[in-house]
Amino acid sequence: MARLQQSFQQVTLKNLAIYRELNLICQAFQAAEVPLIVLKGGYLATAVYPHIGQRAMGDLDLLVPPQQLPQAATLLDKMGWQTKRPYTIESRLEHDLHLPKLRKVGSPFEVELHWNIVRPGQSNEMLPDALWPHTIPFSSAGPAASAFAFHLQLIHLIIHVAHNHQFSFDLRSLHDIALLLKKHGESVEWHRFVDLVQKWGWQRHAALVCCLICQI
């Protein structure tokens, strides 16, 4: 029990540090007029979980429009978020969905700057511009921050589990989805969920994840 309590306290302190930095990032992006979507744990820890210490985060995932990626990367660099790994924006846009992990001296976490939620060149590729109409305000991160609307949040979590990580995950990933449905299931616009899953070709992934969720 003591170890669990210690772990809970450590996660809580780390997440509080993440949210402090997230608010600073949101302020800088707002001043520069760079739209920002908070992804995965950065949203779920306060919007879905009962307590901020119940959802561990290894990094902070953020998404910006691809055309503003250079500006966003420069802003983060000025705030101390940097990588020693050489890269070019053009190459990353062509082959990946986020920049190399960014680290800041003294920070216990990393930042991943995304412009999409799937890699380019796949049969069920999603254009980044198609994501932005499906957002909601996320006040925990700041007045200008957004998160995916519940139907797209669910799709993203399904893609993250079933496609990006090929079901190589711990139970936290499924727990994220189960809690999202428990807390916000009635607010999910299911017709939009079905339309987008069919449009983007994620039916099989969604069915597999839903079968697993039903057994939790």
Residue ranges and their predicted role:
Residues 1-58, 64-216:
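Conserved NTP-donor binding/palm subdomain of two-metal-ion nucleotidyltransferases/polymerases, i.e.
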